């Protein structure tokens, strides 16, 4: 099986704060499979580290109101194209991210409050009938 994984889950230091979300569960789950790492935010041209971003009324913004929506959408499209081109069967995504959140995202107030919703990349994957899993489902 070919599996795409949020790069931060495999230890890539691509999170907004320069860190990662390495998951031993993910590393074990993907052993023996063909793996493709993706970080839509990096693919969209955003630096590491970078200001935190949340989806505010459908637009990805920094806390000061600066829009980074174009970068998030560009990265999501590029990551989707990579997933499709590579013939990926499953995508494992980081929880709560404005790119990769599967079930919940932050509410746009930068208060740490979660609401039901999906990240930009996750929406594109689902619209293209690509199977996704939140890391918490492993």
Regions found by a protein language model. Name each.
Residues 94-105, 109:
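Internal, conserved structured core segments that host functional sites
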Residues 87-92, 100, 115, 120:
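Short, compact, well-ordered microdomains
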Residues 22-36, 75-90:
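Short amphipathic alpha-helices and their capping/turn segments at secondary-structure boundaries
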Residues 11-18:
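Short N-terminal binding/cap micro-motifs at the start of the first secondary-structure element
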Residues 21-61:
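Short, surface-exposed acidic-centric catalytic microdomains
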Residues 8, 94-97, 137:
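Short, well-ordered beta-to-alpha junction loops that form the rim of enzyme active sites
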Residues 1-4:
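Extreme N-terminal starter segment of soluble prokaryotic enzymes
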Residues 43, 53-55, 59-78, 82, ...:
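Divalent-metal-activated hydrolytic enzyme cores
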